[in-house]
């Protein structure tokens, strides 16, 4: 009996290994001080940290959730990599020249080296974004049509075959459509004028196939196009029927789509409906929840719903206990008795840094007033020294804190903080005035804070008068 069990166990191990539902990923990173590489996929159902030794070497077995496009991140630099079960892929790169130095060897190297070369070709053809997009529409169309042909010729000259080649051909097509879509956006960004577009300009995007699961797991441009298709078609549908809700629109749009992960992407775009700005968010929540299939997304929208419920105006804000730049720790309870204006930021967040001069001015404007300005950084442990360096460099003022677990800290999760910068206003009792306050640079921020302070003064005087009586 024992021999039979051992034989069955050996058979199971052999069977499991022979399927090779994993990728071996190894290599060397020159000139890096980082001790780990982060690997993940676009669905966010695979995330792993791979250790990098003191010589820059790494090696790990990755039990991937599906073939497709993944990303590897070292420090702040990251790039795409294609994984498929059975790949034995070796990567070498120089952290000082991250993108240009990438080279792959081993099984799976052909498609990944092709991708590196195609990315370099794209950078060369596009060049300066302003010069590329700010041209008459006729010239732009001629340019992207020509570039598409160049990319297709480049693919034909490669060694790729079969499905791998077809996947890359579709990537070229989707990249072309996304570039076409972005013309208006980039042109307007640089000129502040929306260019006149020919009739039917967006038709190829509106009429695109929304049920291509292979493209979905391999191609970020395809995912972005699904989002843009959603925006274009929802706008059109609501112009025809103003009574149509976003939730009803999505429910109708996904009914003929077979891919559950594509359906989930479309439904997840409704998460913004779970907001105090939407008076129907309580009834929208169960309708959105029932359309989702992924447990991860169900948990995410439920957490957001609970967060909105718990962070409504006049609700007590959750406490925090964060490191203070000046030493020790600061809790929200320590700030009780003052209005608290919280600005959530990070050293790597460009828009956050752009808000700093305005925040500095606010702190000066309200010096001596009953308000505390608190900047909370969500930087990771790896960026601790950057935070310590940037605080005195920018010299914003106020109270400078560092969240213990970044966006995963309880305070951040309670407020469903996803995008930064984010501003929050609390009253003297630590209760929420607004979970989304105007940014420091907004035109109405100063007058809004003034009105809150004046309200407090009037309330205090009224209480004092009552006590005397």
Predicted features and spans:
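Bacterial Sec-dependent N-terminal signal peptides
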Residues: 1-27, 452-456, 460-463, 467-469
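A non-transmembrane, solvent-exposed segment enriched in polar/low-complexity residues
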Residues: 17-167, 171, 178-196
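N-proximal helix/coil linker or "cap" segments that precede and/or mark the start of modular domains
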Residues: 244, 251, 261-323, 333-338, ...
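Short, internal strand/loop/helix patches
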Residues: 323, 388-424, 428-429
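Conserved redox-active cysteine motifs that mediate thiol-disulfide chemistry
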Residues: 336, 344-361, 375
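Conserved helix-turn-beta segment immediately C-terminal to the redox Cys motif
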Residues: 356-377, 392, 447-448, 452-453
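Thiol-based oxidoreductase modules, predominantly thioredoxin-like and allied folds used
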Residues: 370-384, 396-407
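Thiol-/selenol-based redox modules, centered on thioredoxin-like
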Residues: 425-469
């Amino acid at each position: 009996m024992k021999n039979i069990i051992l034989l069955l166990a050996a058979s199971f191990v052999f069977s499991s290994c022979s399927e090779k539902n994993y990728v071996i990923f190894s290599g060397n990173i020159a000139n890096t001080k980082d001790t780990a590489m982060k690997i993940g996929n676009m669905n966010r159902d695979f995330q792993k940290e791979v250790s990098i030794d003191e010589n820059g070497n790494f090696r790990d077995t990755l039990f991937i959730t599906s073939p497709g496009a993944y990303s590897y991140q070292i420090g702040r630099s990251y790039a795409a990599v294609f994984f498929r079960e059975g790949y034995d892929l070796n990567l070498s790169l120089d952290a000082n020249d991250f993108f240009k130095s990438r080279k792959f060897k081993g099984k799976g190297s052909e498609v990944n080296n092709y991708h590196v070369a195609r990315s370099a070709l794209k950078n060369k053809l596009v060049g300066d974004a302003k010069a590329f997009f700010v041209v008459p529409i006729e010239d732009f169309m001629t340019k992207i049509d020509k570039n598409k042909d160049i990319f297709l010729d480049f693919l034909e000259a490669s060694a790729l075959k079969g499905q791998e080649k077809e996947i890359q051909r579709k990537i070229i097509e989707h990249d072309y459509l996304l570039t076409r879509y972005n013309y208006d956006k980039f042109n307007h960004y640089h000129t502040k004028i929306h260019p006149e577009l020919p009739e039917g300009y967006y038709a190829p995007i509106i009429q695109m196939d929304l049920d291509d699961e292979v493209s979905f797991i391999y191609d970020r441009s395809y995912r972005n196009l699904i989002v843009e298709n959603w925006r274009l078609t929802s706008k059109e549908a609501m112009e025809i029927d103003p009574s149509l809700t976003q939730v009803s629109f999505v429910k109708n749009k996904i009914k003929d789509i077979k891919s559950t992960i594509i359906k989930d992407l479309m439904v997840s775009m409704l998460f913004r409906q779970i907001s105090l700005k939407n008076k129907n968010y309580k009834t929208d929540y169960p309708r959105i929840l029932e359309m989702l299939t992924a447990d991860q997304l169900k948990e995410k929208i439920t957490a957001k719903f609970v967060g909105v419920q718990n962070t409504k105006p006049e609700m007590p804000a959750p406490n925090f206990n964060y490191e203070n730049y000046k030493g020790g720790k600061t809790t929200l309870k320590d700030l009780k008795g003052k209005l608290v204006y919280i600005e959530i930021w990070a050293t790597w967040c460009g828009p956050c840094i752009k808000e700093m001069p305005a925040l500095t001015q606010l702190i000066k404007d309200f010096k001596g007033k009953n308000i505390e300005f608190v900047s909370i950084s969500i930087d990771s442990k790896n960026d601790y020294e950057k935070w310590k360096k940037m605080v005195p460099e920018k010299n914003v003022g106020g109270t400078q804190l560092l969240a213990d677990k970044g966006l995963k800290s309880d305070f951040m999760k309670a407020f469903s903080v996803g995008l930064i910068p984010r501003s929050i206003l609390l009253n003297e009792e630590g209760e929420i005035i607004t979970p989304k306050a105007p940014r420091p640079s907004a035109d109405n921020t100063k007058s809004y804070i003034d009105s809150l302070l004046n309200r407090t003064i009037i309330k205090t005087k009224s209480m004092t008068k009552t006590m005397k009586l």
